[in-house]
């Protein structure tokens, strides 16, 4: 029997603590793995009495049995704070609470799937993607790396989502729509046409949006 893993959560603020709660509800908790602590370098963030902050994710040296989960919402932050750990060949946890995964669908290393996410057949989910509760990913959808998809999002069949994309809650991506790298989809938007890389869209139908 292999030794249990020691889970380290990157990010000790609100979402990190939500991830801690989800991990503790998992049936494998304290059987296959335990919780070692948080990694966080923000001076105003404190650990919990039973879950300390172990150090800075940019300088932490991996110890035997460590396995990591990235609880940072921003794709840019997720890239930044996983990079030094990936350079050390860190192992990353896949959290999949009540995930419904279709035939031939694939999911990448370090993904987080909140409660009741549904991924249909032949979908491909890249590394370090976060998909929050009750979102539906249609058949053949391709999602790149480090994306963040909010609650109650629907991605229609064969849509293509680039890397580092943020899709806010209750958005709908119509079938076969392509969304470029780094695009942002506003809450409640209905995306009926392709979205270029780095563009923010909002509304129904979704149109280019700029903060003034």
Kindly label every feature range from the protein language model.
Residues 1-9, 133, 145:
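Glycine/serine-rich loop-strand microenvironments at binding/catalytic pocket rims
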Residues 4-23:
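Glycine-rich adenosine-cofactor-binding loop
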Residues 9-10, 39, 71:
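Short hydrophobic segments within beta-strands
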Residues 23-27, 85:
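Active-site catalytic pocket residues across diverse enzymes, especially alpha/beta-hydrolases
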Residues 26-46:
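NAD(P)-binding Rossmann-fold cofactor-contacting core
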Residues 43-101:
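Phosphate-bearing ligand-interacting subdomains
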Residues 94-209:
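Structural signal for interior beta-strand "rungs" in well-ordered beta-sheet cores
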